Amino acid sequence: MTISPPERGSTAKTQVEKVDNPATFELFGKPGHFDRALAKGPKTTTWVWNLHANAHDFDSHTSDLEEVSRKIFSAHFGHLAVIFIWLSGAFFHGARFSNFSGWLADPTHVKPSAQVVWPVFGQEILNGDMGAGFQGIQITSGLFHVWRAWGITNETQLMSLAIGALVMAGLMLNAGVFHYHKAAPKLEWFQNVESMLNHHLAGLLGLGSLSWTGHLLHVSLPTTKLMDAIDAGQPLVLNGKTIASVADIPLPHEFFNQDLLAQLYPGFGAGIGAFFSGNWAAYSDFLTFKGGLNPVTGSMWMSDIAHHHLAIAVLFIVAGHMYRTNWGIGHSIKEILEGQKGDPLLFPATKGHDGLFEFMTTSWHAQLAVNLAMLGSLSIIVAQHMYAMPPYAYMSIDYPTQIGLFTHHMWIGGFLIVGAAAHAAIAMIRDYDPAKHVDNVLDRVLKARDALISHLNWVCIWLGFHSFGLYIHNDTMRALGRPQDMFSDSAIQLKPVFAQWIQGLHAAAAGSTAPNALAGVSEVFNGSVVAVGGKVAAAPIPLGTADFMVHHIHAFTIHVTVLILLKGVLYARNSRLIPDKANLGFRFPCDGPGRGGTCQVSAWDHVFLGLFWMYNSLSIVIFHFSWKMQSDVWGTVNADGSVQHITNGNFANSAITINGWLRDFLWAQAAQVINSYGSNTSAYGLMFLGAHFVWAFSLMFLFSGRGYWQELIESIVWAHNKLKVAPAIQPRALSITQGRAVGVAHYLLGGIATTWAFFHAHILVVG
């Protein structure tokens, strides 16, 4: 930490400007008001596409960084308003159309539902039997499990949340208008990163986690302890009254009574005095370090979760006091960056990170790229933890929800990471000034780009041929009837020794890394089977040859995705083929007429191609997860303790050939969606067909050129002219880039919705 004389800190001054810029619907109601050319109105049908392309591209509206910053800031509030409206809808469905109370009363037999289809002409077939006499559509979002963890015990509370979320949405819309049209922050406020870090770390994350800890301790902990006791058939007694049903549980405000809490957790009786006297051990009954899962609910211990949030709060509150603002103490991000000079032996860089502070505070695309890469990676980490360390009660035995949440968080992560590459490339084109980056780390990476990309390309070729080659070998050997010559657990073994070592390390280290923990961090690492309601909630995940092989397919597809995206960023400004690429912008179809072979070189085209490989990568990841869990983890527990897995452990022997994946996974597990007609999952059958159609529709845009359509349009316009019904707005074919955008959008939408239907129809029936 650097301590400097007080004059180094900036003095407090107003960072908000009062603006007289009234919000008028007259202006908003005019399409294209943000762009001179678009504001003139449509002459051709291209106008509507340009309207969509540029509406949120604030850089194209103005070059004033302060104005762009204010628009982004205001849009954030609009986004938050949409999120609150969406949340309100979820709460409202829970309050009005769900079996939440029925599920709380018997979570191992009742399935969660928050939607009832009204009969028009037979649609009520979609309402399946959810148990306890409720007919509806099964939901797989995990919301019931989350609500139980919050301590919600009835539908009235959900209705209050629904109303509260709408109020919050109104406040957010108001804030968005206020901070753009009435009192708008100055550019220096947006660029004051130390203040932002302090407030976001200490305030948002630190105090946010601390207040959430308070809720967990004073509401969630007592409520869920009483519910767990009811579910275990051993109800607890409060004030001499047996809490035999959810309706008997005191409401949250009643837990303000400390004596009530102390009956459940004696540590609450110690009061606040124990905190200030340093007698923190008094709180050890509700701030625990148990590890493992609660055997009643198959989820992490609520007291562990509360302890975790308290620790996070302390860390972030400390972190939020580290950066230098009005007082001359603390870190300066600019000084930290400019102090980085590389490794003197391996990578000496005298200019190090010089210029990066200015780049990151004047290019919001560069800032966004870093944030998207981090958030996308975090989403993928969340996907892994939701099954390995399930945080919410009974979620681990709700297999449809487990597959749904894994798939959802993987795809969200993939889209965000591709977005990171997109905005990094935009930053390079619109915001990067080569004169300000001479021999710093960014410049050095750009100078080394040929070595980086050619080596990465070699890695992709190596991984692709070797991983796919193992499968081709196995398919061939199996076809020739030579199982002894196959790569498999029973013939030529390819054990994932590094993965097994990491699994063992985590299992063995539980006592040493967390000295007071009573159990390992996760049962998936050489733990034991946790069964809830006769179903497997968690179990060790054995890894073998089949996992080793598909892991290398993952490595291959991820590396190709990175190759495409990284090439797009590193060659965004220029290349040997097109030295003046930066002048052509982020998206362009080709380098003008007369230069053949220069199509699909724009940074936008790399994002376009990267999206296909991202989809490719993650399809294999979610297929691997879905099949592996059904084969080796999930299932029913027999009376003798043995486990009957959903697909009877067929992964190890079937997933080692291409034919096995096609026959024993895709084809076998599509049986439910293909045979869904006439049952309550028939909507997924229709979705499966419809989404295949959307996917096939995308190929029309991807496989045909613009000229074909322009020619067709001109003959159709001729016919309209003959009949004297010619349109005033001239029809035009989509541009090359627009066609590709429509194509990839439908490709992904069709593919994702097909997978959604395939997974749901199957696991809702067998899970």
Swiss-Prot record:
Main location: membrane
Protein location: Cellular thylakoid membrane
Pfam families: PsaA_PsaB
Binding site for phylloquinone: W709
The name this protein goes by in its record: Photosystem I P700 chlorophyll a apoprotein A1
HAMAP family in alphabetical order: PSI_PsaA
PANTHER family: OUTER MEMBRANE PROTEIN, OMPA-RELATED (PTHR30128), PHOTOSYSTEM I P700 CHLOROPHYLL A APOPROTEIN A1-RELATED (PTHR30128:SF19)
Source lineage: Bacteria, Bacillati, Cyanobacteriota, Cyanophyceae, Synechococcales
Function: PsaA and PsaB bind P700, the primary electron donor of photosystem I (PSI), as well as the electron acceptors A0, A1 and FX. PSI is a plastocyanin/cytochrome c6-ferredoxin oxidoreductase, converting photonic excitation into a charge separation, which transfers an electron from the donor P700 chlorophyll pair to the spectroscopically characterized acceptors A0, A1, FX, FA and FB in turn. Oxidized P700 is reduced on the lumenal side of the thylakoid membrane by plastocyanin or cytochrome c6.
Quaternary structure, from the entry: The PsaA/B heterodimer binds the P700 chlorophyll special pair and subsequent electron acceptors. PSI consists of a core antenna complex that captures photons, and an electron transfer chain that converts photonic excitation into a charge separation. The cyanobacterial PSI reaction center is composed of one copy each of PsaA,B,C,D,E,F,I,J,K,L,M and X, and forms trimeric complexes.
Superkingdom field: Bacteria
Residue positions binding chlorophyll a': H692
Membrane spanning stretches: 72-95, 158-181, 197-221, 305-323, 364-387, 403-429, 451-473, 548-566, 606-627, 681-703, 741-761
